[in-house]
Amino acid sequence: MSAHTDRRHHVQSGLMRESLVDKSVIRSTETPVVRMLPEAHVVKIGGRSVLDAGRGVVYPVIETLARILATKKLILGVGGGVRTRHVFSIGLDLGLPTGVLAQLSAADANGNAHILGTLLAPYGVVAIPPEMFGHLLPLFIHAAPGVIFNGMPPYSLWEHPPGLGRIPPHRTDAGCFLLAECFGCKSLVLVKDVDGVYDKDPKDHAGASLIREISATELERRALPSLPFDRVLLRLLGTARLLKKFQVVNGHRPELIEAAINGKHVGSIVFAG
């Protein structure tokens, strides 16, 4: 059939005949990204840092979150805490691969998500099952003041092998970061049991100095032996398009969570660069 009589619609696609491993082609895909949930805040509640600490720590955090939820939209991620560490110990002893460890830790984090959801249920916030969370998040966040998820990115069996050891590198801090980046959220706050990032582990060194603000590049260069968040966040900050910083605050001082959500510098800020 000649070009003059062919009435079929032909879709023009810039990538149709291109190799997706060609660097020049990949460079051409650097285009603006839409922010799907620009007014929502992602807050990671540490499993070991907060939930495992018991009623005396958890209830004041719940009261603070309830107060924030009256005016802000929150996406709450939760870690697996001590149960995940126990499962890791068993799995490592049995020779389980990294992907299986990631799958098991997601189950522990999911349990903590339901605990947090039970405590926040009076405020209209519940835990959403991971299989539907990502697809329906915009609906949930517009229908309720906040939602809770298990924090684990769904790499599961496809988790990346770490450079050292077998612990999954993308854990709940990374999952919360990636969610905030994908949906273009307003901020990411990591709630821990320390005041922020220190030059040494403050639990072992009384004279450790708090680092109030630092770039991901500088933090990587320093190669500190201990960080209060997943180390892979430093690499993720370097490639993120929408999320350019996060703040680490102490959940044992719950008023700092609200201050951080309101844009105040009350912990350690790690920024891209």
Label for each model-derived stretch:
Residues 2-273:
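C-terminal catalytic "cap/lid" subdomain
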